[in-house]
Amino acid sequence: MTAQAPEAASPVLCARLENVSKLFGSFAALRQVSVNLEPGRCYVLIGENGAGKSTLLRILAGLLRPSSGTIRLFGDEEPHEARARIGYMSHAPMLYDELTGVENLRYFASLYPGRACLEPAEALREVGLDPTLNRPLGQYSQGMRQRTSLARVLLSVPELLLLDEPFSNMDVESAHQMVDLLAGFRQSNRTIVITTHQREQAAPIADWVLRLKAGRVADFLPGSPRL
């Protein structure tokens, strides 16, 4: 099944996947997935555990290679070639509990020598956090931890944001704050791909909803973004 938005005169696609499959031994995590992602849109991936959502996200991020099929980003780049233009936030925040938010970001910024990056304090402000907060991350609420993780992703000023379960373990208020943040990024023409079990939480910003079932695209439906 080929999943794509209706054809229209538009900029170069953010991503094009054609018949992408991924095998782990004899298990097919993805089966002939074809999808086009347009720039400046928000795509929400839903499906049961094991449907292939996180696998698809990791392939887009260049962290996994497909077993077959082709994927091109920003025209004609392979994911590993486009890594500098991609921001990937994993389900488990990659942060250090003993460091403050700004100390965490300074460390991760040091891993990108020579690459244009946001200042750590600026990245924290973008997600609504106070960079002067002198508290170790281990004392942050889950919502603050998730926003710090998102700030880490923003350091490299990515054009494509890949967010694996960004609303995980959040209370309702924190989830609403995250949705508001993502709405702002979407309006700045970033492309966003979200995996979630809570479709209703992402509904206000979803341009398209892609439902995976047993590694295949079962539905690719227009959303009703309100933000």
Predicted features and spans:
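Helix-to-loop junction immediately C-terminal to a conserved catalytic motif
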Residues: 61
